[in-house]
């Protein structure tokens, strides 16, 4: 019953008009009025921001803020996979040969997430990792490894919450939400970086258009907090053992080791 009511309320409020109004407000000068309150409520680390709080003219500018030079370091070990974002480590685990994985008691289909069987097949038996970005986090997304970009594509139309309630009561938000996917071939092995849109503000802006990408290079940004899913081929990585669900991650921090490079 609780799940049914939750989904009904989300459907009633999560329309194109609502998203349009919220997006327009966030991009307007009027939104600057609530920037101080927003920064206080979400405890934004102002010492790391590229500009002072009063220099951001709109909420959108604050959402998509850059960091001061040198505030994040990228692990340079050739064998390392690094966190592509600042966020909370939600979960990781095996992708079944059926091209599915379980998180928070919910089964997700890689076929649904990536849009077709052919794309999903290369990740059967592989590993998934999920990182959640809250409204307080730095919202820019960087590459977790170096390689050649093989494909970029967008799927889904609407987005549902990806917070704790959304993950428990929502309808597979990680594979159903609006999402932007970048696939990278690194030394013959594939990784998919799935950028999952957040409810209401359904926007993911791509910044990287070249055919190659370097580890730590900026690729895109969310206009609000959301979630990143990483998919790796079978026998490609070993997740850092110390990583725990709920742990805070910083951009550039090592989260896994390339098995072929050990």
UniProtKB/Swiss-Prot annotation:
Its BP terms in the Gene Ontology are: phosphatidylethanolamine biosynthetic process
- Look up and give the membrane topology term: Peripheral membrane protein
Identify the coding gene: psd
Q: Which cofactor does it need?
A: pyruvate
Its Gene Ontology cellular component terms are: plasma membrane
Site residues by UniProt (Cleavage (non-hydrolytic)):
225-226
PTM Pyruvic acid (Ser): at which residues? 226
Q: Where mainly found?
A: membrane
What keywords is this UniProt entry annotated with?
Cell membrane, Decarboxylase, Lipid biosynthesis, Lipid metabolism, Lyase, Membrane, Phospholipid biosynthesis, Phospholipid metabolism, Pyruvate, Zymogen
Q: What does this protein do?
A: Catalyzes the formation of phosphatidylethanolamine (PtdEtn) from phosphatidylserine (PtdSer).
The protein's annotated catalytic reaction(s) are: a 1,2-diacyl-sn-glycero-3-phospho-L-serine + H(+) = a 1,2-diacyl-sn-glycero-3-phosphoethanolamine + CO2
| Functional pathway | Phospholipid metabolism; phosphatidylethanolamine biosynthesis; phosphatidylethanolamine from CDP-diacylglycerol: step 2/2
What protein is this chain from?
A: Phosphatidylserine decarboxylase proenzyme
Q: Which proteins does it associate with, and in what oligomeric form? A: Heterodimer of a large membrane-associated beta subunit and a small pyruvoyl-containing alpha subunit.
Enumerate the active-site residues.
86, 142, 226
Q: Give the family, as the similarity comment puts it.
A: Belongs to the phosphatidylserine decarboxylase family. PSD-B subfamily. Prokaryotic type I sub-subfamily.
Cofactor remark from the record: Binds 1 pyruvoyl group covalently per subunit.
**How is the protein modified post-translationally, according to the record?**
Is synthesized initially as an inactive proenzyme. Formation of the active enzyme involves a self-maturation process in which the active site pyruvoyl group is generated from an internal serine residue via an autocatalytic post-translational modification. Two non-identical subunits are generated from the proenzyme in this reaction, and the pyruvate is formed at the N-terminus of the alpha chain, which is derived from the carboxyl end of the proenzyme.
- In short, the EC number is 4.1.1.65
> GO: which molecular function terms?
phosphatidylserine decarboxylase activity
Pfam families listed in its UniProt record: PS_Dcarbxylase
Where found?
Cell membrane
């Amino acid at each position: 019953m609780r799940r049914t009511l939750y989904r009904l309320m989300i459907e009633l409020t999560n329309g194109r008009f609502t998203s349009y109004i919220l997006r327009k407000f966030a991009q307007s000068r009027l939104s600057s009025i609530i920037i101080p309150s927003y920064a206080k409520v979400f405890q934004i680390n102002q010492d790391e921001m590229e500009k002072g709080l009063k220099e951001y003219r709109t909420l959108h500018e604050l959402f998509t803020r850059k960091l001061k030079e040198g505030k994040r370091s990228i692990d340079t070990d050739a064998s390392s996979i690094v966190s592509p974002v600042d966020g909370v480590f939600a979960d990781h685990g095996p992708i079944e040969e059926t091209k599915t994985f379980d998180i928070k008691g919910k089964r997700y289909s890689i076929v649904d997430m990536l849009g077709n069987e052919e794309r999903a097949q290369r990740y059967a038996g592989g590993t998934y990792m999920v990182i959640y970005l809250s409204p307080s986090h730095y919202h820019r997304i960087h590459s977790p490894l170096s390689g050649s970009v093989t494909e970029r594509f967008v799927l889904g139309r609407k987005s549902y919450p990806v917070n704790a309630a959304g993950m428990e009561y929502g309808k597979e938000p990680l594979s159903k939400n609006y999402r932007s996917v970048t696939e990278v071939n690194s030394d013959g092995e594939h990784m998919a970086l799935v950028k999952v849109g957040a409810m209401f503000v359904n926007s993911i802006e791509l910044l990287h258009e070249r055919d190659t990408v370097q580890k730590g290079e900026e690729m895109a940004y969310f206009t609000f907090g959301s979630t990143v899913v990483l998919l790796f081929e079978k026998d490609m990585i070993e997740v850092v053992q110390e990583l725990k669900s709920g742990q805070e991650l910083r951009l550039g921090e090592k989260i896994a080791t390339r098995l072929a490079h050990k």
